[in-house]
């Protein structure tokens, strides 16, 4: 009997510590969902960062949105062909893309920055405090009751 890791299937949710627990579920686009390449980093106990290789894109070409617990990052290069230019080899990909990441509860996007061709999206986990247990006195017995 061979062991099978589910970790690669759950690569696109952010918020837990281990890969099997780290990811709630994956959102897969088309077969080309590995473009552009990206990293998911953990910084301390409560901070995460998604770094997306966005070489050749400007801030105006990128869109970052969070809706219903899904972080969506899309990019589309505007046509900017110079007249008289013929590409002998065009190896720099400038195609449109869309990546989606399901955020688990209590993960918030704190900001995004494009620097040196890398789009960094900062995430933080904000876990609400647990309510303190309440004690009540029974009118008949005069002793505390736990709720």
Curated annotation (Swiss-Prot):
Keywords on record: Stress response
Residues covered by the sHSP domain: 29-141
Keyword Nucleotide-binding: no
One Pfam family from the record: HSP20
Keyword check for Glycoprotein: no
PANTHER family from the UniProt entry: PTHR47062, SMALL HEAT SHOCK PROTEIN IBPA
Similarity remark: Belongs to the small heat shock protein (HSP20) family.
Protein name stated in the entry: 16 kDa heat shock protein B
Organism: Azotobacter vinelandii
Gene assigned in the entry: ibpB
């Amino acid at each position: 009997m061979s062991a099978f890791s589910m970790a690669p299937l759950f690569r696109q949710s952010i918020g837990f510590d281990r890969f099997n627990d780290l990811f709630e579920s994956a959102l897969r686009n088309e077969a080309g969902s590995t473009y552009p390449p990206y990293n998911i980093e953990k910084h301390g106990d409560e901070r995460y960062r998604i770094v997306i290789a966005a070489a050749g894109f400007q801030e105006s070409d990128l869109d970052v949105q969070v809706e219903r617990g899904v972080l969506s990052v899309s990019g589309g290069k505007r046509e900017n062909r110079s007249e008289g230019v013929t590409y002998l080899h065009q190896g720099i990909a400038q195609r449109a893309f869309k990546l989606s990441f399901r955020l688990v509860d209590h993960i918030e996007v704190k900001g995004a920055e494009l620097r040196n061709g890398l789009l960094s999206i900062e995430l933080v986990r904000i876990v609400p405090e647990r309510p303190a247990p309440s004690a009540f006195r029974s009118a008949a017995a005069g002793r505390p009751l736990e709720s």
